[in-house]
């Protein structure tokens, strides 16, 4: 349910915050715990396009800081490879947490995209996640990202590998879109921790 998801997001936020040079665990925890409050409202139920935006106004009324208000509104950005990014690092953290949580939940019950079938838009979630990590951090540490998941999930070797290979595939496609040559990517793209400088040197 929404409460359980909010708890998961708060924990993921704390673990990936350092990737974005954000170490305020109290704020990261609060961000996750309140990130889905608008989804239980009748207004968002009737107009789902208002999710996030509705929460921003609720946060404003309840005295949340402006950076958290923006983060609540921007948590669903970017859409895939779209360049419309969150306005601050808190928004980026919450977006990445949302997407890695979504992937882990679907993958854990065997709902993995195959061929052209992707009814739950999981490739888009993967693209959004890679997009933010590329533009907002200095590393693409897939291990650290996956280790941010619930302990039970992060110890499931099969699940971890499925998510990792999926994200590596999304990263490969993202970098091709960014103008990298496929033959030069092959040698380094399967590494767990990837320094962006390594990629930029071969572009």
Residues covered by each model-derived region:
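Amphipathic alpha-helical "coupling" segments that flank catalytic cores
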Residues: 1-203
């Amino acid at each position: 349910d929404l409460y359980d998801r909010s708890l998961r997001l708060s924990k993921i936020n704390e673990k990936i915050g350092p990737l974005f040079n954000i170490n305020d665990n109290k704020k990261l925890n609060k961000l996750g715990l309140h990130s889905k409050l608008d989804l239980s409202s009748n207004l968002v139920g009737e107009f789902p396009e208002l999710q996030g935006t509705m929460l921003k106004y609720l946060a404003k009324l309840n005295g949340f800081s402006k950076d958290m208000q923006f983060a609540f509104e921007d948590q669903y950005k970017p859409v895939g490879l779209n360049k419309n990014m969150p306005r601050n690092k808190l928004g980026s953290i919450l977006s990445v947490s949302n997407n890695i949580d979504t992937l882990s939940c679907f993958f854990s019950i065997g709902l993995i995209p195959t061929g052209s079938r992707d009814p739950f838009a999981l490739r888009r979630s993967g693209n959004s996640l890679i997009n933010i990590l590329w533009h907002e951090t200095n590393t693409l540490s897939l291990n650290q990202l996956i280790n941010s998941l619930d302990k039970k999930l992060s110890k499931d070797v099969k699940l971890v590998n499925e998510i990792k290979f999926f994200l590596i595939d999304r990263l490969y496609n993202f970098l091709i879109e960014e103008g990298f040559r496929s033959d030069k990517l092959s040698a380094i793209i399967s590494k767990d921790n990837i320094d962006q400088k390594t990629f930029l040197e071969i572009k």
